[in-house]
Amino acid sequence: MADILTQLQTCLDQLATQFYATIGYLSTYHDNSPATTPTNIPNAAPALAKIPKNSTAPPVPAGAPVPSQSSPPPPQTQRGASEAAADPNLPPAPDSPRTFASRQRELARDLIIKEQQIEYLISVLPGIDSSEAEQEKRIRELEAELRGVEEEREAKIRELRTLGRTLERVMGAVETGIYGDRAVLERDS
């Protein structure tokens, strides 16, 4: 298992990916219906028909006379649903309001769950609720504990070497035989 900081970084990366995917879904599959204007505020947002569209003509200097507008290009013919689905350049059809709302709730729930995972990982980071002095004290305690464990390890290594030498003598005795040279065995012990 990875350490807490690695898990936290992974969760943050996943959260960023989820944000990107959520925004992508919402902008792709929304029906883009106009927002309803508040009834108590007249002209809160101008109707789209009143907003002039950007001109494709080159910019004209401020003092120059404005040329007359040519007739707008004829509207494009409506394409059939099968033709629109076959063209990869067209955006996909929006989801039904029910499906869109369901998926929107699911995406929001996923974002909340990931955010809660991140909060949990942050809460279990060491030192979150302790002062600098307490953290330094804890580090000194851990250093002392580490020294003790290291001394135990070195003692076990010495014991292992002693047992290894004893085992070599026993193996030598077996090699010499039970009734062989007992003087060698007595001398080594």
Curated annotation (Swiss-Prot):
<dbReference type="InterPro" id="IPR021384">
    <property type="entry name" value="Mediator_Med21"/>
</dbReference>
<dbReference type="GO" id="GO:0006357">
    <property type="term" value="P:regulation of transcription by RNA polymerase II"/>
</dbReference>
<dbReference type="InterPro" id="IPR037212">
    <property type="entry name" value="Med7/Med21-like"/>
</dbReference>
<dbReference type="GO" id="GO:0016592">
    <property type="term" value="C:mediator complex"/>
</dbReference>
<comment type="similarity">
    <text>Belongs to the Mediator complex subunit 21 family.</text>
</comment>
<keyword id="KW-0175">Coiled coil</keyword>
<keyword id="KW-0804">Transcription</keyword>
<keyword id="KW-0805">Transcription regulation</keyword>
<dbReference type="GO" id="GO:0003712">
    <property type="term" value="F:transcription coregulator activity"/>
</dbReference>
<feature type="region of interest" description="Disordered">
    <location>
        <begin position="50"/>
        <end position="102"/>
    </location>
</feature>
<dbReference type="Pfam" id="PF11221">
    <property type="entry name" value="Med21"/>
</dbReference>
<keyword id="KW-0010">Activator</keyword>
<keyword id="KW-0539">Nucleus</keyword>
<feature type="coiled-coil region">
    <location>
        <begin position="127"/>
        <end position="170"/>
    </location>
</feature>
<protein>
    <recommendedName>
        <fullName>Mediator of RNA polymerase II transcription subunit 21</fullName>
    </recommendedName>
</protein>
<comment type="subunit">
    <text>Component of the Mediator complex.</text>
</comment>
<comment type="function">
    <text>Component of the Mediator complex, a coactivator involved in the regulated transcription of nearly all RNA polymerase II-dependent genes. Mediator functions as a bridge to convey information from gene-specific regulatory proteins to the basal RNA polymerase II transcription machinery. Mediator is recruited to promoters by direct interactions with regulatory proteins and serves as a scaffold for the assembly of a functional preinitiation complex with RNA polymerase II and the general transcription factors.</text>
</comment>
<feature type="compositionally biased region" description="Pro residues">
    <location>
        <begin position="58"/>
        <end position="76"/>
    </location>
</feature>
